[in-house]
């Protein structure tokens, strides 16, 4: 894992023109995506930096759930709405936001309330940063979004661990009861993971087993990001193979006609 990851990371270099370096982080529900991102930020010493000065920021796909109709919200409150389907997300807004980030613009991120299943009126302001981590269960599903990432990480955690984490999270943070959580998992979450999320694992440049517990993989990624922040990497290679690996943009060209399921 360590050797392969290190060689792969060497091929993902800072984009031309000093644009923000976008990293996509995908994986199943409660796989540890947020924890991996938080660990990266912590190891970079960015977790207590003033938001105006942050070099590394984290965005969540969960912020971009679509505004539900009254009928959809009623289903959601009963645990009968599929939040793990690609159509549950505002993919146009995700692409627009990430595109503006690559252009160095300040963006406004929606705030989603998981208790009321609605988008709040306030937004979160994200200022230009050198590195942006975008995490979500379907971060790699849309090709136009996927193609914006210079690096793609997949957090690979076993199903039992993910389910136990989801139960604890949804009870403590989202006010759900156990019966509703398990029903939703069996009806929507597990089938959607197998149909929409798991097939996108093939797009990952680095797979991280055990999530935030895998410090070997995370330290390699952190070192790579540190090199970017310190200007230690040369401009991105775009002409063929590098150290025996194909740069991600070259691979993505061959992925264009494929669908993740």
From Swiss-Prot:
Q: According to its UniProt record, which protein family does this protein belong to?
A: Belongs to the uridine kinase family.
Does tRNA processing show up as a keyword for this record?
no
Q: Tell me what induces its expression.
A: Following crush injury to sciatic nerves.
What is the protein's given name? Uridine-cytidine kinase 2
Q: Which Gene3D superfamilies match?
A: P-loop containing nucleotide triphosphate hydrolases
The organism's lineage?
Answer: Eukaryota, Metazoa, Chordata, Craniata, Vertebrata
Function (record text) = Phosphorylates uridine and cytidine to uridine monophosphate and cytidine monophosphate. Does not phosphorylate deoxyribonucleosides or purine ribonucleosides. Can use ATP or GTP as a phosphate donor.
Q: Give the enzyme's EC designation.
A: 2.7.1.48
Record-listed substrate binding positions: 84, 112, 117, 166, 176, 184
- Stretch list, region Disordered: 1-24, 240-261
In the record, biological process GO terms are: cellular response to oxygen levels; CTP salvage; feeding behavior; protein deubiquitination; response to axon injury; UMP salvage
Q: Which GO terms describe its cellular component?
A: cytoplasm
Where Phosphoserine occurs along the chain?
254
Modified sites of kind N-acetylalanine: 2
Molecular function GO labels:
ATP binding; cytidine kinase activity; identical protein binding; uridine kinase activity
In which organism is this protein found? Rattus norvegicus
Listed under catalytic activity are: uridine + ATP = UMP + ADP + H(+); cytidine + ATP = CMP + ADP + H(+)
Q: What single Pfam family name could you report for this chain, choosing any that match?
A: PRK
Question: This protein's superkingdom?
Answer: Eukaryota
Bias (Polar residues): 1-16
